[in-house]
UniProtKB/Swiss-Prot annotation:
Species name: Caenorhabditis elegans
Record-stated family: Belongs to the protein-tyrosine phosphatase family. Non-receptor class subfamily.
Protein name according to UniProt: Tyrosine-protein phosphatase 1
Record's catalysed reaction(s): O-phospho-L-tyrosyl-[protein] + H2O = L-tyrosyl-[protein] + phosphate
Enzyme Commission code(s) on record: 3.1.3.48
Source lineage: Eukaryota, Metazoa, Ecdysozoa, Nematoda, Chromadorea
Polar residues compositional bias, start-end: 446-456
Localization (cell): Cytoplasm, Cytoskeleton
Keyword Cytoplasm annotated: yes
Entry keyword set: Cytoplasm, Cytoskeleton, Hydrolase, Protein phosphatase
Region (Disordered): 376-396, 430-456, 489-515, 584-616
């Protein structure tokens, strides 16, 4: 019998057919890890497991080999209102660190490698790329608009593919979701699209590599930032990274303390102290910073210890033994150092095949747990896969406060053992740490279909026990603990991890099986060789190597009848991770190839035998001028092997894959043995390759790393202002000049003069260079990295081609005499910028041009001949130039020009002084003739207040040498002390990179002393009685 009422259980009905949420066994806990692509995955571990167990599971899940650069971060739960970001300590119990569930962690890069080229494994590079891109999107890696547009163009190239008009809207859509900053101009997407067109042909790995190489030059790259206040109660940000400690105020870097100068790090409650050695190497200065809380202060101190130990030491120091009474923190980083990581990679066996599928991160506008202080701890509780961002998201208004700086090359041959304590000072002792750039892998050959079994096999191996150790007791630490450390402090433990299902990956659905071509972003791959090229996709495996390509790029290459870019084979057993490439396909346009590290003469030696597996074949085509872009030295007639002595930036040799590097030994040229050839014969063979049987392609068989096993470390430009020794204020004014020159002589003898020079910034922080990078102005720059500051650039008023010229005003003031020497420092004119050059000379009323280069040097055009022959007239726009005098001596050429404006019929006279005795490479052996030339320039300046134009080829090297020499001469005549480093700093505040090399700086310092001691320059009578 039915009654008139009933019920319907909604909850029970919906639960029918659903898979119940699995709960971990009682003796296990579930940890949720969010990866850099915003996907999450659940890992189950034993309750009492150490952090290393979870780390190893994550590393094996992501198939990461170079593990030491990464870590897991979580939000610390405590009684304070402020949230704290902490790194998971591998050596401690996980539950004790995170207190209570949910155990939600985030996979992040912990140690940012200074040179992305050191990352051998592509999986590692991709994780770095995702991390740096995320930092950029979220405002934690500020840069100017030009740099942001360039980096964004590489992102689009890597994730969308080659630029096409029909996909231009896709590029704009991609950028709108990935880079959302309210301060960007409306035409930002168009600027990115213009740069995107220059990257046609770059495969994802090449675009990502270029992205990382440009990003690492940003000042806040790799910085772990903590808020604080300085002694003047100004809000500051303290960044800790691979190069040392940087201090920022309102987005501007105020100071930098390199690890080599730091003697001690300590903290007490909210006070963080840095003991820094002064330039004299004897005295020390204590820098005190106040941090927001005592806990954050301790985290900052720990971060400094970890960064210093990882990047500067060979092995971590031993943990001090516990005593009866312990005071101060005993924290020490016990993980593996970068040196150990590189050494292990060098001895690791070569890897086999591994399919690689990229995926786009989810939209960055969804803010995460770490986006602000108002976030509650509950917001970090996740039960399902979700979207999140990285910790510490600053306001987007800080984006344009930073400026992109070029990386300064610091040649370091030693690392320091740094003393850490909570209450005392300690001395830093040097340790030799040669870093080898060669790294390989030890994976067995397999395909993606066998990846789960591979993971299980790898997990059975010993897991390296790395992490941090801190005793419960607190005590200070003495420097001998690190200085006498000899053991690596690495322990082995066995990690037992369950096999991971092949259907679940951190990239979710984007990590598809090998048989499904993944072409959603303009790239397609497949595991088997295609029988034809109609699919616009090629196999990622060619002769046992990994290869990926853009379908569009392949089709275009095939249409031209040229080898497609994806057929560039990457041999994982080669020291270069590659065996052959075509330079014309390696890169296009901006950022074609990452710059290499400088190498010292000591690195050109090898004591170890080199096997046959280290022989690499490089293929390259000449540029449109018929040049390959490299020089060699040696030969049978010189009893020296043929070694690559120079590789020009942006040349074919620089862009080819693998890149040709300085120090490589050339064994064969187009199959011919060069061991018995003379130097001239070798050069002839290289030049003849342009018309050889290979269709103009040069084949070099080289032995890399033989003469440069110890690759030196790149560090970004230091804006810490070095302060060399100065004359004391108590010294009478009449003696300050002689005392300052004596200090200069002592610095030259000790070599400190070079150290001071290399510490000085190359480009002034905060000075923008946006005008020179506009599309209309790119062709007006002789070298793409030599650009004028926007604030001090010379602006043309009546030039048909626009107001831009690569030139800066440089004014050098002599305080006591009231003299201001005015210069216009510019690059050597190009053929199509000669008219602009003469317009500048006319508009600035210049009467003297100083030229410090010849037209060609070693067969290369250094400057266009922008003047007519003697008694001839040449038209440059509205200006008529006539050479009325041409006199040449052994060291100089003197010319006089008549310039007439056709519109106004006004005529002027301009003198050109060309110094031709400067050698093609290096500096003159004897400064005598150069001193005489500078004296003649000073005489030509007398009685004139108008600027003189000074140029060489780039307008920074020899140009800076002359400006410094003349300024020093004026200071000597005014009886003022001479500090060359201060002069260079003033010069670089007006034009970047003036005086380009340490050799040039040393030469001009020696010239100053030589001119003073010879009496060429001396104090004038009216100033000598001060």
């Amino acid at each position: 019998m039915r009654l008139g009422s009933n019920s319907y259980d909604v909850q029970r009905t919906e639960a029918i057919g659903q898979t119940p949420v699995k709960t971990p066994p009682p003796n296990q806990i579930r940890c949720t890890v969010t990866f850099l692509d915003s996907t999450s995955y659940h890992f189950e571990i034993e309750k009492n497991s150490l952090g290393i167990v979870l780390l190893e599971k994550v590393f094996n899940y992501l198939e990461i080999i170079e593990k030491d650069y990464f870590g897991l971060v979580f939000i610390a739960v405590d009684n304070s209102s402020a949230q704290q970001k902490k790194w998971l300590d591998p050596s401690k119990n996980l539950r004790k660190q995170m207190i209570c569930p949910p155990y939600h962690l985030f996979f992040r890069v912990k140690f940012y490698v200074r040179d992305p080229n050191r990352l051998r494994d592509e999986f590692t590079r991709f994780q770095f790329y995702q991390q740096v891109r995320q930092n950029l999107e979220e405002g934690r890696l500020p840069c100017n608009e030009g740099s942001l547009a360039l980096l964004a163009s590489y992102v689009v190239q890597a994730e969308v593919g080659d630029f096409e008009e029909k996909t231009h809207g896709m590029s704009r859509t991609c950028l709108c979701y990935k880079i959302q900053f309210a301060t960007l101009p409306d035409d930002f997407s168009d600027r990115v699209a213009e740069l995107h067109q220059l990257h046609i042909g770059q495969t994802p790995d090449v675009a990502e590599q270029n992205f990382l190489d440009h990003a690492r030059r940003l000042e806040m790259y790799g910085m772990d930032v903590y808020d604080g206040v300085d002694a003047n109660h100004l809000p500051i940000e303290i960044g800790v990274g691979a190069v040392g400690i940087k201090v920022f105020h309102e987005g501007i870097k105020m100071n930098e303390y390199a690890w080599v100068r730091i003697r001690k790090l300590s903290f007490k409650k909210k006070q963080f102290q840095v003991l820094v050695a002064n330039e004299d190497g004897v005295s020390e200065t204590i820098m005190i910073f106040n941090i927001m809380s005592a806990k954050i202060c301790k985290l900052l101190w720990k971060c400094c210890i970890e960064q210093h130990t990882f990047f500067r030491l060979k092995t971590p120091p031993k943990t001090p033994q516990r005593k009866v009474f312990n005071f101060g923190s005993k924290f020490r980083y016990s993980g593996r150092t970068e040196y150990q990581t590189l050494e292990e990679n060098e001895h690791r066996k070569s890897a086999g095949h591994r399919n690689f599928h990229r995926s786009l991160s989810k939209s960055s506008f969804l803010r995460s747990t770490f986006s602000g202080n108002t976030q509650s701890i509950d917001s970090s509780r996740y039960t399902n896969t979700t979207t999140t961002d990285s910790p510490e998201l600053p306001s987007s208004g800080q984006l344009l406060a930073r400026r992109l700086l070029s990386a300064a090359r610091h040649d370091t041959d030693s690392s320091d053992a740094l003393g850490y304590a909570s209450d005392g000072a300690v001395v830093c002792a040097p340790l030799t740490t040669p870093l080898s750039p060669r790294r390989t892998r030890d994976y067995a050959t397999d395909s993606e279909s066998s990846a789960p079994s591979l993971r299980q096999q790898r997990l059975s191996k010993e897991a390296i026990y790395y992490g941090t150790q801190e005793s419960c007791d607190e005590k200070s630490w003495t420097p001998s603990m690190a200085c006498t450390s000899t053991s690596p402090g690495i322990h082995a433990s066995t990690a037992s991890v369950r096999p991971v299902s092949s259907g679940s990956t951190p990239n979710g659905a984007s990590r598809k099986s090998a048989n499904s071509g993944y072409s959603g972003y303009g790239y397609a791959t497949q595991t088997q060789q295609p029988t034809s090229t109609t699919n616009a996709s090629y196999s990622p495996y060619l002769n046992g190597t990994i290869s990926r390509s853009s379908g569009a790029a392949v089709a275009k290459a095939a249409a031209r009848g040229l080898p497609p870019t994806n057929q560039q084979a990457y041999n994982t057993s080669s020291p270069r991770n590659s065996v052959a490439s075509y330079s014309s396909f390696a890169s296009a346009g901006i950022g074609g190839s990452p710059p290499r590290s400088k190498r010292s003469p000591q690195s050109n030696k090898s004591s170890s035998p080199v096997g046959e597996d280290q022989v690499v074949t490089i293929k390259m085509r000449p540029d449109r001028h018929g040049r390959f872009g490299f020089n060699v030295k040696g030969g049978a007639d010189q009893n020296y092997p043929v070694i690559v002595s120079r590789v020009a930036p942006g040349s074919s040799a620089d862009k080819c894959q693998p890149r040709l590097n300085e120090g490589d030994q050339v064994l064969f040229i187009d199959g011919r043995d060069v061991s018995t050839m003379s130097h001239d014969h070798v050069v002839q063979f290289i030049r003849s390759a342009r018309s050889g049987l290979n269709g103009g392609e040069l084949h070099l068989t080289i032995r890399p790393n033989v003469y440069r096993l110890g690759e030196e470390v790149d560090e970004p430009d230091s804006t810490m202002v070095p302060e060399p020794a100065r004359v004391a204020d108590s010294v009478p004014n009449s003696d300050k000049l002689s005392k300052s020159l004596q200090l200069l002589a002592d610095s030259l003898n000790s070599g400190k003069v070079v150290d001071h020079f290399e510490m000085l910034y190359r480009k002034k922080p905060g000075m923008s260079m946006n005008i020179c990078r506009l599309t209309a102005n790119l062709a007006k720059n002789r070298y793409r990295d030599v650009c004028p500051y926007d604030d001090t650039r010379v602006t043309l008023q009546a030039s048909p081609s626009g107001d831009y010229i690569n030139a800066n005003y440089v004014n050098m003031e002599i305080p006591s005499s009231g003299i201001v020497n005015r210069y216009i420092a510019c690059q050597g004119p190009l053929a199509h910028t000669s008219s602009d050059f003469w317009v500048m000379v006319w508009e600035q009323h210049c009467t003297t041009i100083v030229m410090l280069t010849t037209i060609t040097e070693r067969g290369r055009v250094k400057c266009h001949q922008y003047w007519p022959r003697v008694f001839e007239t040449q038209e440059y726009g509205r200006l008529m130039i006539k050479c009325i005098k041409d006199k040449q001596t052994t060291n100089c050429c003197y010319r006089e020009f008549s310039i007439r404006d056709r519109n106004s019929s006004e005529e002027r006279r301009v003198t050109q002084m060309q110094y031709i005795a400067w050698p093609d490479h290096g500096v003159p052996d004897d400064p005598k003739h150069f001193i005489q030339f500078v004296d003649e320039v000073r005489k030509a300046r007398q009685g004139s207040v108008d600027p003189i134009v000074v140029h060489c080829s780039a307008g920074i090297g020899r140009t800076g040498v002359l400006i410094l020499m003349e300024t020093a001469a004026c200071l000597v005549e005014s009886n003022e002390p001479v500090y060359p480093l201060d002069i260079v700093r003033t010069m670089r505040d007006q034009r970047a990179m003036l005086i380009q090399t340490p050799g040039q700086y040393t030469f001009v310092c020696e010239s100053i002393l030589r001119a003073y001691h010879d009496g060429t320059i001396k104090p004038l009578a009216e100033y000598s009685k001060r």
